Amino acid sequence: MTIHSLEDLPAEGVSGRGVLVRSDLNVPLDENGVITDAGRITASVPTLKALLDGGAKVVVAAHLGRPKDGPDPKLSLEPVAAALGEQLGRHVQLAGDIVGTDALARAEGLTDGDVLLLENIRFDKRETSKDDGERLAFAKQLAELVSPEGAFVSDGFGVVHRKQASVYDVATLLPHYAGRLVADEIRVLEQLTSSTERPYAVVLGGSKVSDKLGVIESLATKADSIVIGGGMCFTFLAAQGYSVGTSLLEKEMIDTCRRLLDTYHDVLRLPVDVVVTEKFAADPPPQTVAADAIPADTMGLDIGPGSVKRFAALLSNAKTIFWNGPMGVFEFPAYATGTRGIAEAIVAATGKGAFSVVGGGDSAAAVRALGISEGSFSHISTGGGASLEYLEGKTLPGIEVLGRPQPGQTEGGGPA
């Protein structure tokens, strides 16, 4: 699929031009509102800097969390504006609203090389509305912030699988381009789906089988092996007839897991041992047991050392690796060993020439939390859900729209 890229925009000249950029600045905050992981802010900088250095008047739209009933002071983008300004090396204005009088006045007052961050885009319910008309009306107001002759740059890969006003609808109204982050993500994922060097190993973790079912079924016919860890492995173990104690279990998915094991028994790889404890907390003493001998009064919170050793050996021979989801509750030091072991095995394989992709979300957070160099992997995605849906073969609305003719053009590129 051919999409319009950011490299096409400077050719037309951005100096003095208003550019609306949809970034993914959805960073985690602690109880005091302090950013605990600025990875997504860092990832947004190259596109913004390129536009600002070119003299564009940049208006940034982004969200934080999931506001339920309109504006929520705890989800204001104020700390994000400060952090973004530090990384850009210039002042970032924060509008007090999204498309209201403050945002309009600030947008009109921008000079070349200025940047304005709108308040949390999801404070307006129309952003995520299922009603096409509501979303389009909101998108038109967003487009007005960079009119006349405005442009739209999509650089929030973590939201391109959402059909939302600032992701999809605004791209139907303005000349649209993929930012550097989005273009790079697409290039990497295309490599995982169309030009994969084998052996191809996939590592899947996280809590629920239901969240990963689509990608398991899609990749089981493409990958040479799929390692299953994290909370989801216990539903697979239960499908084999094993008792899993009080471990996380999706009973409604047991039959599905049994079918997957029957169909893809030569591809799926399950843990041979797990680390268990009596309650979900950081302090109870951990115990390593065989995967088929989990005590009834315990829950599994990590894969065991035997599993790490077996999976690491498999990964050492891989030429392509995709990893999405931690192997255990890495936030608790006693149950981070499995995730660390798998991460280090992928790093080692990468050092030997393997192409490795960390599929965003909790996996990327785990890499940073465990102090593992991000540069040790070939690519760390900023979009967990978007990456999975792309690999499933789904159409991502925010990507599909970037391949459409620019407003006023036909499919052939000429005027309408």
UniProtKB/Swiss-Prot annotation:
Binding positions (ATP): K212, G300, E331, G360, G361, D362, S363
Gene3D superfamilies in the record: Phosphoglycerate kinase, N-terminal domain
Name under which the protein is recorded: Phosphoglycerate kinase
Disulfide bonds: none
Family: Belongs to the phosphoglycerate kinase family.
Main localization (coarse): cytoplasm
UniProt keyword annotations, A-Z: ATP-binding, Cytoplasm, Glycolysis, Kinase, Nucleotide-binding, Transferase
Coiled-coil regions listed in the entry: none
Residues that, per the record, bind substrate: D24, L25, N26, R40, H63, L64, G65, R66, R122, R162
Protein's cellular compartments: Cytoplasm
Pathway terms, separated by semicolons: Carbohydrate degradation; glycolysis; pyruvate from D-glyceraldehyde 3-phosphate: step 2/5
Organism: Mycobacterium ulcerans (strain Agy99)
The keyword Nucleotide-binding is assigned to this record: yes
Statement: the UniProt record of this protein carries the keyword Cytoplasm: yes
